[in-house]
């Protein structure tokens, strides 16, 4: 029974990976690029990006995102495991927003050269509406960090914070994310301070977000605006 059980578990995991993976770009062996691209540290590597709608891209195609465009520029294998509405700490399966990331990371592929986690927006919203503090988020974020380090000991791992959303619990959530990641020596791109994404301004959102009332999801122009910041950050890892 043991071999059968192992095979059954492997099959379930494979099906779960297929169900959760939003897009898989493979390396193009005939890719043409200038030498400065081909010689870059990102070129031809495998990128796994994991998170919420900042990764799945809400109602727009994944191909419009900064991370997909980055992968295409450097001919990377690209594996997208975004899930709209997903949280680091809170299970939202009943709402069709998926299990919490501190558990869901286990379905990620075994190999990656770069692992990017974009998360925290929905946790902050939940804490804002329920009035609870950050202790539970902190505890489960630690589980996620430890799990990813163990799963990907040779990968370049980093987190990206949400934007500087002007609502309660977003600053508190971001402070915890920065603190916890620092305690594990995980690099973080602090998008609340360094992104150039002015989420508090309606005119800015009308140009660069998927709708003027949206405070999370960039449109294609917004992703193009943010891409150079993340490109510089990732090339420096």
Regions found by a protein language model. Name each.
Residues 1-50, 54-62, 71-73, 108-111, ...:
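N-terminal secretory targeting modules
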Residues 64, 68, 72, 139-146, ...:
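Solvent-exposed, polar/charged alpha-helical surfaces in well-ordered, non-transmembrane soluble domains
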Residues 77-79, 156, 185-187:
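Conserved beta-strand segments of alpha/beta enzyme cores
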Residues 121-122, 145-179:
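Active-site segments of SGNH/GDSL-like serine hydrolases
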Residues 94, 164-237:
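Catalytic His-Asp segment of secreted/periplasmic serine-dependent ester chemistry enzymes
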Residues 81-83, 160, 191-194:
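Conserved beta-strand termini and adjacent loop/short-helix elements that scaffold enzyme active sites
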Residues 46-48, 54-134, 139, 168:
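Conserved SGNH/GDSL esterase-like catalytic core that processes O-acyl groups on lipids
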Residues 20-34, 121-144:
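N-terminal-biased segments
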């Amino acid at each position: 029974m043991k071999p059968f059980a192992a095979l059954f578990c492997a099959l379930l995991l494979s099906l779960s990976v297929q169900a959760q993976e939003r897009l898989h770009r493979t390396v193009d062996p005939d890719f043409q690029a200038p030498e400065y691209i081909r010689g870059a540290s990102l070129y031809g590597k495998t990128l796994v990006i994991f998170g919420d709608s900042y990764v799945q891209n809400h109602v727009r195609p994944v191909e419009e995102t900064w991370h997909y465009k980055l992968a295409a520029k450097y001919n990377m294998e690209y594996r997208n495991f975004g899930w709209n509405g997903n949280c680091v700490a809170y299970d939202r399966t009943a709402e069709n927003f998926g299990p919490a990331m501190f558990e869901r990371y286990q379905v990620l592929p075994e190999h990656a050269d770069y692992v990017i986690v974009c998360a925290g927006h929905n946790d902050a919203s939940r804490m804002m509406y329920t009035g609870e503090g950050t202790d539970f988020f902190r505890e489960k974020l630690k589980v996620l960090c430890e799990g990813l380090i163990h799963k990907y000991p040779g990968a370049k791992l980093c987190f990206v914070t949400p934007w500087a959303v002007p609502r309660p619990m977003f600053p508190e959530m971001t402070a915890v994310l920065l603190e916890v990641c620092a305690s594990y020596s995980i690099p973080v791109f602090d998008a609340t301070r360094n992104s150039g994404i002015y989420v508090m301004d309606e005119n800015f959102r009308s140009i660069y977000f998927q709708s003027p009332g949206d405070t999370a999801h960039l449109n294609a122009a917004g992703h193009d605006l943010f891409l150079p910041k993340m490109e510089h950050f990732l090339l420096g890892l």
